[in-house]
From Swiss-Prot:
InterPro entries: Aldolase_TIM, HPS/KGPDC, OMPdeCOase_dom, RibuloseP-bd_barrel. GO terms for biological process: 'de novo' pyrimidine nucleobase biosynthetic process; L-ascorbic acid catabolic process. Binds 1 Mg(2+) ion per subunit. This is Probable 3-keto-L-gulonate-6-phosphate decarboxylase. Signal peptide: none annotated. Its EC number is 4.1.1.85.
Length: 225
């Protein structure tokens, strides 16, 4: 794979706030995520408006889908999302339904610049056998989260985190990594071959958002040539 991409998670409750947040760093990011809170508050309107405003960036709808997979996937993709998140806790049938919808969209529109894809959110209980099953379904992407408690406690990425990421990488799944990512963290993942993106939310909003985005891009350029 090429260089990892940089993704902003828009976790504001209101679209007006999210639009201000993304505007200040629009030239430094590759992926825009309609976060779960924003999607619940504003619905697919947020996806449609961001798609219209940013046609050249990858757009993620972070629904953390756990049920009604086919319906939610269709809603997100029709609104303009490129990727849809599905919870690792979702029933296998839900994951399969979401993947089927993505494949149907790609078949109907074979020349899409960014194919529709499913991302599995690695929250809660999951195991590597399940990851193999997802790959067999055709799902290529997953999102690895550092422990929320560890993040809030100011703890760094653990050896277990790195081991998990290395094993996921060896299976061939494309990983996005999140959980309080800072520029100083990026060197920990420089040997990850299938690294899709780094995701940051709070770090990229506010007065220092643009500066942090530039630092993250600089580190990506340093470690991935």
């Amino acid at each position: 794979m090429g260089k990892p991409l940089l993704q902003i998670a828009l976790d504001a409750q209101y679209l007006e706030t999210a639009l201000v947040d993304v505007k200040q760093i629009e030239h430094n990011i590759d992926i825009i995520e309609v976060g779960t809170i924003l999607a619940c508050s504003e619905g697919m309107r947020a996806v449609r408006i961001l798609r219209a405003l940013y046609p050249n960036q990858i757009l993620v709808c972070d629904l953390k889908t756990t049920d009604a997979g086919a319906t939610l996937a269709k809603m997100a993709f029709e609104a303009g999302a490129d990727w849809l998140t599905v919870s690792a806790a979702a029933h296998p049938a839900t994951k399969a339904a979401c993947q089927k919808v993505a494949e149907e969209f790609n078949k109907i529109q074979p020349n899409l610049g960014v194919p529709k894809e499913i991302q599995i959110e690695l929250y809660g209980n999951w195991n590597f056998d399940e990851v193999k099953n997802w790959l067999q379904l055709g799902i290529k992407q997953a999102i690895y989260h550092r422990s929320r408690d560890a993040e809030l406690s100011g703890l760094s990425w653990s050896n277990q985190d790195i081991e998990n990421i290395e094993k996921l990488d060896s299976l061939g799944i494309e990983l996005s990594i999140t959980g309080g990512i800072t520029p100083d963290d990026l060197h920990l993942f420089k040997n990850t071959k299938n690294l899709k993106a780094f995701i940051a939310g709070r770090a990229l909003v506010g007065k220092s958002g643009r500066e942090i985005a530039e630092q993250l891009k600089q580190k990506i350029g340093q470690f991935w040539i």
